[in-house]
Amino acid sequence: MKITGCETLHCGAGWRNFSFLKLQTDDGITGISEYNESYGSKGLTGVIEALVETQIGQNPCNHEAISQQLYAMTRQAPGGINQQAMAAIENAMMDIKGKALGVPVYDLLGGAVRDKMQLYW
């Protein structure tokens, strides 16, 4: 399986915008992640697209090695735009890996912590 490209989607929801990354593979599996470009990180979409371009042809199931490559090629600042872009890419790669293995992503991260959650609206 290899990364072939990405698509970014933006949706206005009235009180905030939602942004999504769709990471595509040659096997037809698409990984999806959400990121936030609404507050202070204008340009995040461009950084995500540029970083994905450097990983075309790589196996997204090797997400840790790819994350290390991205870390090495970018200048890091805590909570900075590069870290936000890398997080969106890594989340999409984890989604791909979970789909390929037929397991939820939380199983890849050590298992579920709870089986229900209280909502406030």
Show which residues each predicted segment covers.
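Structured beta-strand/loop patches that form or line metal/cofactor-binding pockets in enzymes
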Residues: 1-32, 36
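Broad gene-expression machinery/nucleic-acid interaction feature
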Residues: 18-20, 88, 118
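Metal- or metallocofactor-binding catalytic centers and their adjacent structured scaffolds
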Residues: 26-101
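Subtilisin-like serine protease catalytic core
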Residues: 101, 111-112
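Active-site-adjacent beta->alpha loops and helix N-cap segments on the catalytic face
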Residues: 108
